[in-house]
A protein has these predicted regions:
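A general structural signal for short secondary-structure boundary/capping elements
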Residues: 50-52, 59
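A structural signal for short beta-strand/turn segments enriched in small hydrophobics and glycine
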Residues: 20-29, 34, 57-69
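Short alpha-helical boundary/capping segments at helix-coil junctions
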Residues: 59, 74-75
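Short, ordered loop/turn segments at secondary-structure junctions
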Residues: 37, 71-72
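Acidic, low-complexity mobile loops and tails
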Residues: 1-31, 40-46, 53, 75
C-alpha cells in the first residue's frame, strides 16, 4: 500500500472517492482548500482506495497522509 499526502496546508473541502473504490492515476481523491484556492490531491498510480485518513472540514498540513492506496503495481 502507498500513502498519499497533501502538498499544501488547508482544510479538506471535498472527498471525491470512497474506500474500496478503484481509481486511475491522476484521479482526484480529494480537494483541499488553501488560501481560497481549491487544490486536487490525485492518485499517484492506478489502484484501489484502502482508506481515507481525513474527513471533509478537517485541517491538513503539508506532507500529512490523507489516504492509503493499494496500487496495481504492488499486486
Amino acid at each position: 500500500s502507498e500513502a498519499v499526502e497533501s502538498h499544501v496546508p488547508g482544510s479538506v473541502w471535498k472527498l471525491e472517492v470512497k474506500p474500496g473504490q478503484g481509481v486511475k492515476r491522476g484521479k482526484t481523491l480529494l480537494v483541499v482548500e488553501s488560501m481560497k484556492m481549491e487544490i486536487a490531491v490525485e492518485a499517484p498510480d492506478d489502484g484501489v482506495v484502502v482508506e481515507l485518513l481525513v474527513a471533509e472540514g478537517h485541517p491538513v498540513a503539508p506532507g500529512q497522509r490523507v489516504a492509503v492506496l493499494e496500487s496495481e503495481a504492488s499486486k
